[in-house]
Each structure stands twice: as structure tokens, then as C-alpha cells.
Amino acid sequence: MKIKISNSNVPAWKDVTVKSRIPAELKKLEEMARNIWWAWNNEATDLFQSLDPVLWKEAGQNPVVLLERLSYEKLEALAADKVILARMDEVYANFRAYMDVKPDANRPSVAYFCMEYGLTHVLKIYSGGLGILAGDYMKEASDSNVDMCGVGFLYRYGYFAQSLAMDGQQIANYDAQNFGSLPIDRVLDENGQPMVIDVPYLNYYVHAYVWRVNVGRVPLYLLDTDNEMNSEFDRPITHQLYGGDWENRLKQEILLGIGGMLMLKKLGIKKDVYHCNEGHAALCNVQRLCDYVESGLTFNEAMEVVRSSSLYTVHTPVPAGHDYFDEGLFGKYMGGYPQRMGITWNELMDMGRINPGDSGERFCMSTFACNTCQEVNGVSWLHGEVSKDMFSGIWKGYFPEESHVGYVTNGVHFPTWAASEWKGVYGKHFDKSFMGDQSNQKIWEEIYNVSDEEVWNTRLALKHKLIDYIRKEFSKTWLKNQGDPSRIVSLLDKINPNALLIGFARRFATYKRAHLLFTDLDRLAKIVNNPNYPVQFLFAGKAHPHDGAGQGLIKKIVEISRRPEFLGKIIFLENYDMKLARRLVSGVDIWMNTPTRPLEASGTSGEKALMNGVINFSVLDGWWLEGYRPGAGWALTEKRTYQYQPHQDQLDAATIYGLLENEILPLYYARNVKGYSEGWVKTIKNSIAQIAPHYTMKRQLDDYFTKFYCKEAKRHAELVANDYAKAKEIAAWKEEVASKWDAIEVVSTEKCENIVNGNIESGVEYTITHVVDEKGLNDAIGIEVVAMHKNAEGKECVYSVTPMEVVKNEGNLYTFSAKFSFDNAGDFKVAYRMYPKNEALPHRQDFCYVRWFN
């Protein structure tokens, strides 16, 4: 018999999943790993790291993955380690003491909607500033014991991971997240099955799973459409953040707003205030309107209720940041909603148009948000002013400076962004009440009592830590991208750990002007190669995959950094994420920001640097316009010299070079006998003491309650009391005014000849009288004298508004009279403005009927 060389059948493999069995002694670790409280508490991350430092790094500093990968033998050893157990018990006791505090019942409850959340680098559901802000906000809501929940998406791929080709071309890599290895929990229904939210998309439903992220005490609920219940066209709705075409964007915004509200309803969650963090979430108010109408209210009554409890925060003045949808596309998915709300299709479209009735105008989410939210705010004082101008067309008859649009300047979550070294300094020298009283400048001023040496050495230690990281990571990415190994040695040798280190890291959009530093390469080369004043620049940031200009900027910087005169002096670090950001904002000496004013809404990366004794050097835009103090940082003038942007760029670049050469570098290198710069340390201390207390997330959260949440919750409660009596009353009053508005008649006017001829003298008081037939509205009309003039910049603005008083009433006839005068001579325009008045309105723009007459 001939023997075969081999003989085997095909194995009948069976897939098995081996889950790590955590010993009972270590169950506390599992509980803490599934609450991202650990992300801003060093004691917790230090504990996880101590279990296995090598594996902690390999696990990407993700405690869920760490516990999964620990061998059973290792787990058994840890369970018997008394030192580890004692440390675990101590951290867990702090965790439970934190978690067991009940929410503050004296503050309104809030539902917070946002497209992205930057909570930890482990959870890739963020791209940049908007998400980081939302993540910080959730954390501070937890720390401040606020009754809040977040609504967002669990992205399968999230935002892209960035790598760079050797020529500097950005490469976008989308890596799928393994949901089973994330600090999240699937939400189950009453039957113990995965909860599913069925979201109507006109002729069919999209089905979304619900996940929960425990952000300390605050829950964040995330929707996920990547499941077999959905078609291949709808599964990708939650694949990528800001990915796909406009149709997918609309699908995302329907899911976030409408799906988010349906999810809260299914979870049994009802809040006092609904906060749309950007226009992406605006459609939540469509679902809310449907719910109230279907419960028995008219559309107008429902609108009063919804508006009174809605807040819209706008984050950008840049047009690309506001979503517009063609009527055909919008109708494809939203066509069924007008009937549910008791309105026509055109009425729904008009709610998203600046010019109602203009069929050529697309539906704008930002406009819809403004029309359905009682309050609107920007994210810094200047951005609030810019937003007033940007949205002024929505409330015709009122000028930007009269707008109700407010602002809350962004802050940052101190425990997340302050390096442990600085937390140690503050903990040692600041009052024990510091963490609960972060806006108290008196506490921050205790930095002046810290020795100069301690401040300098803390900064130096963090810089050296960053330099070590750069050398390691830059070498790794250089070789990964097949760079010349011999050249990397030369480059790393040129990195000077004692040189002044300036950081520039942010989204690479053209208005952020990353190119500004490279306007004059010869002058820049002299600066970076001055042996007496060595300086290095670190760049990092991603450009949107569809932003060719932004990617071009990255490529240009990388190309310049490879030139011999800039080698090791200009460094671009790839894949800017939260982990890298924490290293940069704590490790550099100066944080530079050079946006085109006034396009930087806030720019909170500089605030993060501020918490770490890093000095800001920025354009007076966003938060820095408010934050800058002489002797506590550097600023480019807010004055715009040239309207032609390239000329302004050249001037700003020259200013940057001059400040570096004449002020910044000489100050940094003015060393005393102890080896540090007293002037530099003084600037650090001024920055921390005078600026930092005003830019914490604690202050931001408190501002939202003071300026918006409490006001809205109080008014909303008044409107819904006694079966919505007040809401019905206001809606009926508005309907009556609207029905009679065009019939209101100015019967007669009395004004002196000077006013008629337009020859008015300053300082002289003039009287005007109007008799108005209000057509039965019973003193529901107000009239005022409005004077306009041109300011120093040549822009027309309001000079004065003089209310006219009712001095006589006979039936429907109301006599209005006012005395007014001009303090200044010059050219003015005067007109009379009629408007509906009602003390129950939150502001004039709430019912924007205006008639001008002369």
C-alpha cells in the first residue's frame, strides 16, 4: 500500500469569545473603568497604569482594554497584592464619594445636544474644538453636580487619523472602533434587549441602537445606526463625523435632533432646558413641536412652549460652518412633518429662511435654530457681536446692536487640561476650596507666593518631557513614512531642549493663518538660527479631507521644515488628538494663535495652555480679546490696517517677527545667576493670576445658568402652568396682533417745522406726537423715535432710541408723545418704529413685527 505524504480533513472551527474573568477582589476596577471619571482624575489613571505599565501603554491608556488583556495569572496575582488592593480601595472610595452626591435640585435640568464630544482620546467621537468644548462641558456638569444629559452619536470610524507622506501630503485613515473595548454600555429596554430607536425618514424608518457613556455623574447617550436592521444606505449615518455628502449630513442632523428627542422620550427623560450646541441639533425642536401639537396644543401654542425652553449656541462666523439644504433634498426626508405640526410645507421652509417666501432660498439649520430658540449666544464677547450682525437679517426691523443674541465665553475643564505637575503646584499652594471655587481670582493670586524656581522648574520639566516625546514619536513616524534613517539622526540632534519652544496646533482652516509665520522666510531663518536666542516652532493639526487649501498649508509647512536652515527648528507633529494636545499645551513655552480677525469664535486651546503656565501670543480675537492683560502675554493689535488680506498678513507677520526679536526672546534669555529669567516667571505668574480664573469651564457653566438656563426654565414653567394657560394666552395675543397689524393706522402726526425740514440744533428738545388707531388691540402697540448715524469706521449704527409715551386714549385712538434731542452735531437719520408690546415676551425679537413710518 502506498502511504500518502499527508492526510487531514478540514477543521470545523467554532468561533469563541474569551472574556476576561475579573476576580471579585478587583471588581471595583471594572466599575471605575466603565466611567470616564478616570479620564480627568490622575489618581485613577495612575492606579490603572500601576497594574501593568507596559500593557497600559500597549492598550492605548484604555482601562477597559487593559483589564481585557491582563492574563488570568496576572489578575490572580493582583488580587493577592495588598498594596494594589489598598490603593484601589482608596481610589474607589473617592470615586464612590463623588458619585453618590445627588444632583443640585435648585438648578434647572438640561438636555445637551451636540454632534461630537471630546472626552478622552480613547473614545473617538470628536474632531476638534466643538467636540472638546462639549466634552469639557459634560465633565464640568458632573463636577458641578448638575442634572444634565448629553445626546450625540457613537461613530464607527469617528474622525480620521492623520498621517503624512514624506512630501507632507496629508493621508486620512479611518480606523473602525471596537465598541466592545470602549468605556461605554449598551442601553437595554424593559425586556433586557438592546434598546432601538425608530426614527421616521418620510417613507421608512432608520433604526438606531443606544449606548451610554458615564461621564462621572452625567450620562451621555449615543445613537448608532451601524446595524443589520438598516439598509446599506443608512448604516453609514453614524460611520464618520462630518463625512459623506450633503444627503448624509441631513440624515445625521435628523437623527441627532429628531432621533435624539425620540430617544430621550423612550428613556423617560424630560428636562427643563434643551440646549442645541450648534445648528446640527436644531431639528430636535421639530420633534418637540410635533409632540406638543399631537398632545392637543395648536402650532402657535406649541411654539411658545418649545421656544421658551430652547437655547442655541453658535460656534462660528465662517459660512462653511452653517448648513444649508436644497428644498428638494430637505423635502425628501422632512416632507411628512408639517402635517404633524399643523402647518404647511412652505411655513416649515420659511422657518429656515432669512427671507420667508423666497422659494429660491435654501433651508438653513442656523436660521431654524434662531427661529425656534428663545435665546441665542456666541462663544466670546466679540463672537457674540459678530453673531448679532450675522443673524440680523432674521429679525428685520431691528439693528444688530439691538439684538437679543448674547454670549458666554468658552472655558476649559481644569482637571482635564492641567498637567499633574501643575496640579501638584496648585494643590500645595492654593486654598483647599480651589477645585470648587475655580473662578475666585484671590485663590489664583496665591501663585505669586510660589517661588520663582518652582515655577521655572515645573515649566522646564514639562518641556523636557515634551521634547523626549517628540524625539521618540518623530523618529517613529519618519521611519514609518520611509524617510532616510541617516537624516532623522541629524534632525533629532538639532532639537534643543533648552530653546524657547512655541506651539501652534489647531484645525488647519485657511482663516487660522498657519502660513503667517512663513511670510518672510529669510527673516524667520535668522530668528531660528540666532545662536544667542535659540527658538523652535511646533506645529500640529488636521485639515478636513475636502479642504484642499488647508491640506496645502500642512504640506507647505512640512516642506519648509525639511530645508537645512529649518531642520529641527520647525517641526510638524502628525495626528493631532487629545493625547497630543495635552502634551503640547503643557510642554511648550508660548502658545501662538494667528487667526484672521474676527473669524476665531473663541480659540480655547490657548486657555488650556494658560492653565499650565504657558504664555499666550495671539491676535486679539475670540477669548484673547477679553483675556489679554499687559505683562501677562503678547497680542497683535485688534486694529485692521488693510482691507486687502495679503497686505494685512504681511503686516501681522512683521509684527510677530518684531515681537519675537525685540521682546519675547530677550525676555526669555535674560537669565539671572540662578539660571532662570525673572521677567519670564513674572509673566507666567501674571498670566495665571490675572487671566486663568476667568477661563475655566466652571465659570462657563455658571454663566450658562445665570444668563440662560435659569431664565428660560422660570419662563417655561410659567407658560406651561395650569394646562399651558400663559402659552395659550400669548399665542392668542400674537394671533390677534398679526391679524390686525396691517390695518393699524397712524391717524395724525404733530412735529415742529425743524423736524419736518430736518434742521435740528444740538441741545434743543423737540416734541413729537402721533395719534394711532390700534384697531382694538388695547394698548398693545409701542412707538419709538430711532436716530441713526455713522460711527468712526463709517458704519451706520443706532445713535439713540427714544420711547414714546401714551398720553391720551379715546376708544381705539392712542396718542403717543416724546421729547428728544441730539447732544452732538452731525448728520443723522430719524424714523419712527412701531412694534407690538407685551411684558410677557422675553425680548422684542420674540415677536418680530415692525413698521417704520415718518
Regions found by a protein language model. Name each.
Residues M1-N854:
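Catalytic cores of carbohydrate-active enzymes across secretory and cytosolic contexts
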